[in-house]
């Protein structure tokens, strides 16, 4: 370790000890060397004994700075890892830091724009930042080309070395967790840190955020539910992003929304509809929808529209994940726990050798008490949390896309019920989910699949003669192999002629299945059935030789 890393590690340890976070380590795990090490740091007592553990952890992370604050925010969404009293405290972490010098931001903008002065591209550039966070800060201006109001987001200077240095130390501490905590291995601390690192590094690339915002804007073009500000890609780079300035009411400012005459019930329901549309229609969802990133338009309060900003973190689901997730929700609310268990196995989220009966019983035990509440009071996010926590006992692998989804759903649900406490999430979401599943099966789905594949088939038409020729040639080779096997079988001293028939059929079916498996994977299960039938025939023939 470098001297700088040693100093930083010392500061981290001193901070943890001054907040009494060594209490997190169970006494049976405190070995003699650890105990001696703690006694040697006697001048670092717990100075916050009057505060609960969760609050002390939050305050310690706050003191350690931006990288640790964002790490705590990410951990607050992993309620499968922490008890509620800790997760709730981590959720209170605020990513607010002092702004850096506006003149320095101006220099960065000029460097990104080819060295020309800011005045060459923008009018009314405001040197004082509009907002500031740990990764970037925002300045206002007008585009010189058309006079439109914009905000310019600039990455903090020299932030990358700081992030890398702290991440290195977080990785070191993560490797100690399995040794110090009895449940440390299940927490998979290194994987959690790796997930955080990816999210953090992605946020440092504003070209990625620009592309995300453009995609979301395209998906909701002309939508009455959600507006994404326009991005000006010609002005964007890795360290700078320029987008339309918006004016709206923060979604957390319920008093102003009510004063503006907003239809709160419709607004809450639209939040749910926006989320499920992003997930199931678009397979591309804004995964950082906390209240600070959501506004409501002042216009048409009777027909309210959300405004979304800060698209640095997005999630996506593949077709299989979407289908299994939708069917899981519906099966759960129909209390069909057997179906829920089978879906987890079919999706590959839990190992294929999982005992479905035991898994069903575990899900029933955890989830059935939820239905003691009215449906309107059941939390979708906590349903997912209960399912995933139960599944982890059956060795469910961490699914990053589902973790993002769960986090976003908790945000959406929290905002919706803050706006309209009587919001019935299930009543709002069920028609959407049932309609989506219905659309994925039957004739409409078949026609859509044909339309999707038709261009590929047309493109491959000129190659068809060559493909047919290759198939015939491989077929000849297959026939030659079958004949050779048949001759070898005939040369054996088989006591019953019938056995030769079964052995030949078995060989033919196995070889045919193998050939189709390699050359025609689109035939689905057919090659497998042929090979299975061949093995059965072969086994019957072998038995008849005995």
Swiss-Prot record:
The chain crosses the membrane at residues 501-521, 522-542. InterPro entries: ABC1_dom (IPR004147), Kinase-like_dom_sf (IPR011009), UbiB (IPR010232), UbiB_bact (IPR045308), UbiB_kinase (IPR050154). GO terms for cellular component: plasma membrane. Residues 124-502 form the Protein kinase domain. Pathway: Cofactor biosynthesis; ubiquinone biosynthesis [regulation]. Is probably a protein kinase regulator of UbiI activity which is involved in aerobic coenzyme Q (ubiquinone) biosynthesis. GO terms for biological process: regulation of ubiquinone biosynthetic process; ubiquinone biosynthetic process. The lineage of its organism: Bacteria, Pseudomonadati, Pseudomonadota, Gammaproteobacteria, Enterobacterales. It comes from Escherichia coli O1:K1 / APEC. It is a multi-pass membrane protein. The keyword Nucleus does not apply. Keywords: ATP-binding, Cell inner membrane, Cell membrane, Kinase, Membrane, Nucleotide-binding, Transferase, Transmembrane, Transmembrane helix, Ubiquinone biosynthesis. The gene is ubiB. Belongs to the ABC1 family. UbiB subfamily. The active site is at 288 (proton acceptor). This is Probable protein kinase UbiB. It holds the Pfam family ABC1. Its main location: membrane. It is found in: Cell inner membrane. SUPFAM superfamilies: Protein kinase-like (PK-like) (SSF56112). The keyword Nucleotide-binding applies. Disulfide bonds: none annotated. ATP binds at residues 130-138, 153. One of its GO terms (molecular function) is ATP binding. Its EC number is 2.7.-.-.
